[in-house]
Amino acid sequence: MRAAVALLTAAVVLGVCTTSSTGIDTPVSGEVTVFAASSLTDAFPQVGAEMTKANPNARLTFNFGSSSTLATQITNGAPADVFASADEANMQKIVDAELTDGTPKAFASNRLQIAVAAGNPKKIAGLADLARSDVVLVLAAPTVPAGKYALDALAKAGVTARPASQEVDVRAVLNKVSLGEADAGVVYVTDVKSAAGRVTGVEIPPQDQVVARYPAAAVKGSKNATLANRFIDYLVSPNGQGILAEFGFSKP
């Protein structure tokens, strides 16, 4: 039994079910806790809501945060049943610790975009503008996927940027830009989509782009392995993929 530790993430609780789109019609029940990357904050509750329509006797609790923080919590004994990471490196930490129940499944991909204040008042046109002295830039910390991806993209573009701050996760970057506390931040396309009207997205060209790949796995010792694996199956089902696409995610 893994010891419970304090969770540093926000929790969302939803009823969960299966649907025929998963290929499994048998109802499921019980509870599971899903540790998920912060960029999934909008999409995963909707996935859970759709699953709820068929079986309200099961429940998902979502804990969202940076993938690196969640991976550390799991290796320290946090009671997670499913881990959904925004990168393969943090999932590999769980695999190496022999804490996965089965092979992780890729369920989505994402790409980067520059989030700027609505209307783009600083006329930021690309990554090179992030090095301008009149642009207040924020990035996610390099220890979290979005931060590492941002640095990789800047390196590809040959840009040396000096962020005013390094945030705990990608949603913190988005919030600073949307609140006017920063002029720009490198986030995911899905983040810009979620903040439509509050920020404007500036495209990053293909040659400088970095693709984020999202794997999910059941955590060994889950209190409800059947439901944990059923949720992952739903993510890769046509219905699950359709919901993720609505939020701007691409296929894995």
Each language-model region and where it sits:
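Periplasmic-binding protein-like
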Residues: 81-85
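Conserved beta-strand core positions
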Residues: 32, 58-60, 112
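Exported/periplasmic ABC-transporter solute-binding proteins
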Residues: 9, 17-53, 68, 72-75, ...
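Short, high-confidence coil segments that cap the C-terminus of an alpha-helix
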Residues: 57, 79-80, 182
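Sec-dependent bacterial lipoprotein signal peptides
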Residues: 1-15
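Short, P/G- and charge-enriched loop/turn segments at secondary-structure junctions
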Residues: 100-102
